[in-house]
């Protein structure tokens, strides 16, 4: 009961602070005695009893009192005329904007502290989770991701590090006893942490077990996160995947019966091709990647750019008229493995992982394996031509 009461009190405080934050945000862009100031001062009166009970809100209480004093000063200066009064009003208006900014910062800091505490507490619940706990955790994780997406904030980063949030997230991700949907939401939160500050959190990704967990989870969502992390972390992450022997697992997902998993695995393969060093590329080719790509290109979801020309004619016959880029994008949405062998070869060619001499050698090996994998001379000729001349979406 006490815990419930504390939650209710926090919700009441949060509701008041959100209203104060909105009013102070509006006041920064228009620091004049308008509806925002009126709302802020009314809220200051209403929230006095709430703010006085929380020591961490004492600075906010001080800023609100200062704002009231400054607004009174501005109102008094309007009754007078002359240069001095004009300058006073200008300075006072600037002070209102500054104090409003301080109010917003203090409120956000309080909200961040509460949010990180709630996140750490929710992540500490051992599985199995009740339906209510699962929904609450997913909601808290979504809120956390949204906060991180607003950009870097040093105070927030300090809270995250002090609360060891990354370690808690990783613990949930690698624990197969948690529901898949929870682990996927945790994966998205980890990805957002890397975007928030790659320099601080990438080391924990490379040294921990998160990458192996993403691959073993083998869902379209986990592969989407993996693909994003490869883009962010580049060659070092590909090196880690290769050293763990997990490249073959990603390639095997190209043979999944779920097209969404196949597509995301293909995206991962393309990113690995761009950033992978020779050891990684060699491992992928030895894992029979080229034969698998040829099979995918031959499938209903495959095709080549020549087929795209025929598809364009059919679309025009139906009355569709679009720019070429839009038509290409729509074609690849419905044929995600079109020209996939050449697209992989292009990634190697333009990528950062291979030296020029290595690129030439790998291209020759790809051509050889294409000829071995094709079921007809015509198919081989088409794919070889695409690889030689380049084919990209």
Map each language-model feature to its residues.
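Residue-level signature of the C-terminal ends
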Residues: 46, 50, 77, 126, ...
């Amino acid at each position: 009961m006490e815990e419930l009461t504390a939650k209710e009190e926090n919700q009441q405080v949060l509701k008041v602070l959100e209203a104060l934050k909105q009013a102070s945000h509006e006041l920064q862009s228009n620091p004049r005695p308008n509806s925002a100031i009126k709302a802020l001062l009314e809220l200051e009166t209403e929230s006095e009893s709430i703010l006085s009970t929380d020591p961490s809100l004492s600075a906010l209480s001080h800023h609100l009192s200062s704002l009231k004093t400054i607004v009174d000063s501005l109102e008094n200066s309007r009754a007078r005329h002359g240069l001095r009064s004009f300058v006073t009003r200008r300075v006072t208006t600037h002070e209102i904007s500054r104090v409003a900014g301080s109010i917003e910062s203090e409120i956000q800091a309080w909200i961040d502290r509460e949010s990180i505490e709630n996140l750490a507490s929710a992540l500490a619940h051992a599985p199995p989770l009740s339906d209510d706990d699962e929904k609450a955790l997913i909601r808290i994780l979504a809120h956390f991701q949204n906060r991180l997406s607003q950009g870097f904030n040093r105070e927030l980063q300090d809270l995250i590090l002090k609360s060891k949030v990354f370690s808690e997230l990783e613990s949930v991700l690698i624990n197969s006893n948690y529901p898949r949907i929870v682990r996927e939401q945790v994966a998205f939160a980890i990805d957002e942490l890397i975007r928030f500050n790659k320099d601080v959190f990438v080391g924990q990704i490379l040294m921990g077990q998160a990458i192996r967990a993403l691959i073993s989870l083998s869902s379209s969502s986990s592969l989407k996160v993996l693909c994003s992390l490869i883009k962010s972390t580049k060659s070092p992450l590909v090196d880690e995947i290769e050293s763990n022997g997990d490249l073959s697992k990603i390639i095997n997902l190209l043979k999944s019966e779920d097209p969404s998993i196949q597509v995301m695995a293909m995206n991962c393969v393309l990113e690995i091709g761009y950033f992978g060093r020779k050891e990684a590329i060699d491992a992928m080719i030895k894992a029979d990647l080229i034969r698998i790509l040829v099979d995918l290109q031959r499938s209903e979801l495959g095709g080549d750019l020549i087929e795209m020309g025929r598809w364009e004619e059919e679309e025009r016959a139906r009355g569709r008229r679009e720019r070429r880029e839009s038509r290409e994008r729509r074609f690849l949405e419905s044929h995600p493995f079109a020209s996939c062998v050449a697209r992989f070869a292009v990634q190697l060619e333009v990528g950062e992982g291979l030296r020029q001499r290595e690129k030439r050698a790998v291209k020759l090996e790809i051509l050889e394996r294409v000829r071995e994998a094709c079921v007809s001379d015509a198919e081989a000729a088409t794919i070889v031509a695409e690889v030689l001349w380049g084919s990209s979406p």
